[in-house]
Design a protein with these regions (language model features):
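N-terminal leader/linker segments that precede catalytic domains of diphosphate-processing enzymes
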Residues: 1-120, 125-144, 152-233
Length: 233
């Protein structure tokens, strides 16, 4: 994976266009077989529609890119097979919950998910619900995913004005710090209480990061790169 590069931007210009994905068309049979195998392993996986990015450009404090619609099975195969189509990227938003004592709150993904055991901020691959007109609304995507996973709504946090875009070649994580006026312990307890009320929670737990010693190998490199940049040297 490419060494993470962090771009700080204030504006996202993400258009949604109609276009074919040759990777998905040319390898359809292989993709379907791969998804069938993954679905046997994780029966709750669903082949919905997602949005994949192309041509990310960072300039003048802005990230510009175009997105197109694809099926989740094709996206999953592309990811699992080492990103064979180099012309596209996985561009998604993340809400970096930060408590008033400086702790970051990350989710531990449940065993039934495609990323079981991984630890990262609430997020999700953009889908059709995140389209506004002919544009992708990453801010809305973050708010939706955060509420679904943790129960927190925009009334519970104060969002910073800018995004930290962590670019690692096949992915761009658009991370915005969301400041919550409670301690890390209280924030974790609130999220865990919400998880206990959910019938099928996406998260299995909450992991707090206060220092580099709290980072683990279960976190994607783009997450640890972002957190390291926020913590004291």
């Amino acid at each position: 994976m490419t060494h993470p590069v962090i771009h700080r931007v204030t504006t996202l210009d993400l258009s949604v266009v109609r276009r074919p994905w040759l990777f998905a068309e040319q390898r359809r049979a292989e993709i379907d077989a791969h998804f069938a195998t993954r679905q046997r392993e994780k029966p709750k996986l669903w082949n919905g529609r997602v949005l994949i990015g192309r041509t990310p450009i960072f300039a003048g404090g802005q990230l510009s890119a175009s997105y197109f619609e694809a099926d989740f099975a094709s996206f999953l195969a592309w990811r699992d097979w080492g990103f064979p189509d180099k012309d596209v990227f996985n561009g998604f938003g993340m809400g970096a919950l930060r408590a008033n004592d400086g702790a970051f709150a990350l989710g531990v993904m449940g065993e039934h998910t495609a990323n079981a055991g991984r630890i990262y901020f609430p997020s999700g691959t953009p889908d059709l619900d995140d389209i506004r007109g002919d544009a992708l609304d990453i801010e809305g995507s973050v708010a939706r995913e955060l509420e679904e996973e943790t129960g927190l709504t925009p009334a519970d946090y104060q969002a910073d004005a800018h995004w930290h875009c962590v670019h690692t070649g096949p992915s761009v994580a658009m991370i915005k710090i969301l400041r919550v006026d409670m301690t890390g312990a209280a924030l974790r307890a609130r999220i865990k209480a919400n998880l206990a009320r959910q019938d099928h929670p996406e998260l299995a737990g909450v992991h707090l990061v206060r220092a580099r010693a709290d980072l683990t190998a279960s976190m994607p490199r783009f997450v640890t790169a972002f957190i390291e940049a926020q913590l004291p040297a």
